[in-house]
């Protein structure tokens, strides 16, 4: 690329774009504004960066988060000065909490135009509090060689900090004086003749991969403790690994070395690679609702991989067990919300397996009697689930998750909205071999940005699916504005039960008023008309066969809303009755 020497702001911005491109940046999301003009021009004209204009900053940030999560590389977000950057905040929180790399470039007025009512100026320094992995305000643009080198190296460091030691957001606040347009300045243009671009960027390359492993002594200490325990348990929580197969194989190998069962959350890829792990338990939430069985299955040791599953039943049971726990995760967060007897092991499960000596991998423990008890209970509950779902001809919310686990095209990317969908996935998603790719925002667990994140996940991806409730979709309708530049296909399965169905499952539902108006928040939006407004295809699903037909095959482009109308109270009653049947059956 040729740097832009038309003026100091354009040179400054083009060095930012070129440095990040050489490091591996492929996507920049640009929100409209004047102060960010130099950055917008630099990214828009870069031949190796896809620059995507997005009107709404909140939607833009979640869209970028979806792309970054899928690619495993940072995405740049650009906005103008003032309140624009504040709209990035929810996605910044989610990115920090769930470990997604983002580079936030907020343009700003120069220091002399701040705190003096100059207009469109707020305090943007440390705008996102403690959430960024790193944050800095850049110096004002300069053509001095030392300042250009400073800019390049700051970008290199920002790129690194967004990925190591733990991925997350990085914020660069970038002040500009006029001119903001690429107006020619002869003094700056004259630098082009003597500027050696190749030498300037000679040391800028993508980061080398790093594999972290445990030292042999620590590994052996842990293994000796684990292999001496015949009531051990592995718990695999929500996970979106870059290479799901390697992740699943690592957990399967650990389970077979120890002879321990694996409780796998529905948001873990383990349930979609079930052929890799014969010790898989998917119905733990339903099993543990039986107090007698729950007492019999108390563990002595637990290896918890990543965040805990969503299940409150599981969390209460673990708290009561007071088992010695090892939390395996590269994150520097406190990963123990139960405040138990836990030891943090700051490594990936793949790194843990790499650390285990080959000799110990070859001498696997036999399946424990404890593990067999789990597997027997799991078989009984799975049989009950399948029998109940096969008999269920009426459209109910819970069957959607069960059916999708079996009928989606292989390797389909599936974004699962928060609230009730993630819980039904945990209860009813069946283990299989379709290698479905689950995506979700379980860092802060909010419903904001649902559609925009799903669109980011599916951008330039194979045909994808979003499973969402009506309120989560309506909360992010600005995401539909992304269609002009988004490329791909997204089928949006909307459970329309006229409000927040999850609250029907909570104790507050017995207190009406104020429950109906202030918690369930009924809505009467006609999704058919909403789809027409944004030129999306819409279909009202009439039966389970109709749903299966609509998903096989998935279209190759555009948006398709599949509305499934459900009765909220009926769905709640069905779950309660079925949960009681599970307790009785064990």
Swiss-Prot record:
Q: Which CDD domains match?
A: TPP_PYR_MenD, TPP_SHCHC_synthase
> How does the cofactor attach, per the note?
Binds 1 thiamine pyrophosphate per subunit.
Tell me its cofactors: Mg(2+); Mn(2+); thiamine diphosphate
Keyword set includes Transmembrane = no
Which transformation does this protein catalyse, written as a reaction?
isochorismate + 2-oxoglutarate + H(+) = 5-enolpyruvoyl-6-hydroxy-2-succinyl-cyclohex-3-ene-1-carboxylate + CO2
Question: Pathway of this protein?
Answer: Quinol/quinone metabolism; 1,4-dihydroxy-2-naphthoate biosynthesis; 1,4-dihydroxy-2-naphthoate from chorismate: step 2/7; Cofactor biosynthesis; phylloquinone biosynthesis
Q: Name one GO biological process term.
A: phylloquinone biosynthetic process
State the Gene Ontology terms under molecular function.
Answer: 2-succinyl-5-enolpyruvyl-6-hydroxy-3-cyclohexene-1-carboxylic-acid synthase activity; magnesium ion binding; manganese ion binding; thiamine pyrophosphate binding
The record's listing under PANTHER family reads:
2-SUCCINYL-5-ENOLPYRUVYL-6-HYDROXY-3-CYCLOHEXENE-1-CARBOXYLATE SYNTHASE, PROTEIN PHYLLO, CHLOROPLASTIC
Q: How does it assemble?
A: Homodimer.
- Similarity comment: family membership: Belongs to the TPP enzyme family. MenD subfamily.
HAMAP family assigned: MenD (MF_01659)
Q: Its function?
A: Catalyzes the thiamine diphosphate-dependent decarboxylation of 2-oxoglutarate and the subsequent addition of the resulting succinic semialdehyde-thiamine pyrophosphate anion to isochorismate to yield 2-succinyl-5-enolpyruvyl-6-hydroxy-3-cyclohexene-1-carboxylate (SEPHCHC).
Protein's UniProt name:
2-succinyl-5-enolpyruvyl-6-hydroxy-3-cyclohexene-1-carboxylate synthase
> Lineage of the source organism?
Bacteria, Bacillati, Cyanobacteriota, Cyanophyceae, Acaryochloridales
Gene name linked to the record: menD
């Amino acid at each position: 690329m040729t740097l832009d020497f038309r003026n100091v702001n354009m040179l400054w911005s083009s060095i930012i774009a070129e440095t990040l491109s050489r490091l591996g940046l492929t996507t920049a999301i640009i929100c409209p504004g004047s102060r960010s003009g130099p950055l917008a021009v630099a990214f828009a004209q870069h031949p190796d960066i896809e620059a995507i204009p997005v009107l709404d900053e909140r939607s833009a940030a979640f869209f970028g988060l979806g792309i970054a999560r899928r690619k495993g590389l940072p995405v740049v977000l650009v906005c103008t000065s003032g309140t624009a950057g504040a709209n990035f905040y929810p996605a910044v929180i989610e990115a920090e909490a769930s470990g997604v790399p983002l580079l936030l470039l907020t343009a700003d007025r120069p220091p002399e135009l701040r705190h003096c009512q100059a207009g469109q100026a707020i305090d943007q320094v440390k705008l996102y509090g403690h959430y960024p992995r790193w944050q800095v305000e850049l110096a004002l643009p300069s053509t001095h060689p030392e300042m250009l080198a400073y800019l390049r190296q700051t970008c290199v460091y920002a790129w690194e900090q967004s990925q190591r030691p733990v991925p997350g957001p990085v914020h660069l606040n970038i002040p500009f004086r006029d001119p903001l347009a690429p107006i020619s300045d002869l003094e700056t243009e004259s630098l082009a003749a003597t500027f050696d671009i190749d030498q300037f960027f000679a040391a800028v390359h993508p980061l080398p991969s790093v594999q972290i492993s445990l030292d042999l002594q620590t590994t052996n200490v842990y293994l000796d403790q684990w292999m001496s325990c015949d009531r051990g348990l592995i718990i695999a929580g929500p996970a979106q690994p870059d290479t799901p197969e390697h992740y699943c194989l690592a957990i399967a190998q650990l389970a077979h070395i120890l002879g321990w069962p694996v409780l796998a959350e529905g948001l873990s890829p383990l349930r979609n690679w079930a052929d890799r792990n014969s010790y898989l338990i998917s119905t733990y939430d339903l099993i543990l609702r039986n107090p007698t069985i729950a007492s019999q299955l108390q563990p002595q040791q637990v290896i918890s991989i990543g965040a805990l599953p969503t299940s409150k039943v599981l969390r209460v049971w673990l708290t009561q067990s007071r088992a010695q726990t090892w939390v395996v995760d590269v994150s520097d967060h406190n990963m123990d919300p139960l405040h138990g007897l836990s030891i943090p092991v700051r490594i990936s499960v793949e790194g843990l397996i790499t650390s285990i000596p080959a000799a110990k991998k070859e001498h696997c423990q036999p399946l424990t009697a404890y593990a067999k008890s789990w597997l027997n209970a799991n078989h009984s509950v799975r049989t009950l689930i399948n029998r109940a779902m096969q008999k269920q001809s009426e459209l109910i919310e819970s069957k959607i998750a069960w059916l999708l686990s079996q009928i989606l095209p292989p390797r389909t990317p599936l974004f699962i909205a928060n609230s009730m969908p993630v819980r039904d996935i945990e209860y009813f998603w069946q283990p299989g071999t379709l290698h479905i790719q689950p995506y979700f925002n379980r860092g802060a667990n909010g419903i904001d940005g649902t559609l925009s994140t799903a669109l980011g996940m599916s951008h330039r991806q194979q045909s994808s699916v979003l499973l969402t409730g009506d309120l989560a979709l309506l909360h992010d309708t600005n995401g539909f504005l992304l269609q002009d530049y988004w490329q791909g296909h997204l089928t949006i399965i909307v459970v329309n039960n006229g409000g927040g169905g999850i609250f029907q499952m909570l104790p507050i539902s017995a207190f009406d008023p104020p429950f109906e108006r202030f918690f369930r928040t009924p809505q009467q939006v006609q999704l058919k008309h909403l789809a027409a407004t944004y030129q999306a295809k819409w279909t009202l699903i009439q039966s389970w066969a109709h749903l299966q037909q609509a998903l096989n095959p998935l279209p190759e482009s555009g948006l398709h809303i599949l509305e499934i109308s459900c009765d909220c109270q009926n769905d709640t009653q069905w779950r309660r009755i079925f949960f009681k049947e599970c307790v009785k059956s064990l």
